[in-house]
């Protein structure tokens, strides 16, 4: 079981931000198995029942690949599908909302925290609840930014379209006087430069990827499942449900190297 891989599941390319953090924080002997459901991205515009169904289909596919833990590298799934996943999958299942909320509570100065995410994530109130657990007196302001996902998927992360979209979405949050902004979708760190420039240097941006990676490492250590091998990254495997060449292009640019093992598959079969 120690030598089994770690599943990383997202609706598309955004989960590569979590993949990159896992590769940095975990021992080199760990093997990662990534699934991006690019045929059905974005998840944030779907109903909760649909998101849960998609989440279970993807998790079952990864479980068949012999994983030892599952990382839900998608805020929408983390917001609405974690209970169903933990009931269905007899493995450690880690989402991104809890670690991200805790990180935001550590860095906020005035306890006025903004959260941007998909419509489903913001509607769920999951971040507000998680932040209130750690910092009950905090004021949390949510803003859905659905167009950031297709911009990230297309690689339009630092151009005039991205900048205009950021200004349109984030102006109200700036006026609310937030001092911390949670990037509540794993696609959004791909637009971090534009978001940061829009918000200004006085607003701390919180990316849940590293915090999630540290939680995953701790969970594996607790269970004696952390690999001590010297190699593993060369065996990383990427699966997508559509547009594999587009994923290869954007993913290779973000990760700084080729995606050697990339397959297009059907998880509904």
Task: Please describe what each predicted stretch is.
Residues 1-269:
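Non-catalytic structural scaffold of enzyme domains
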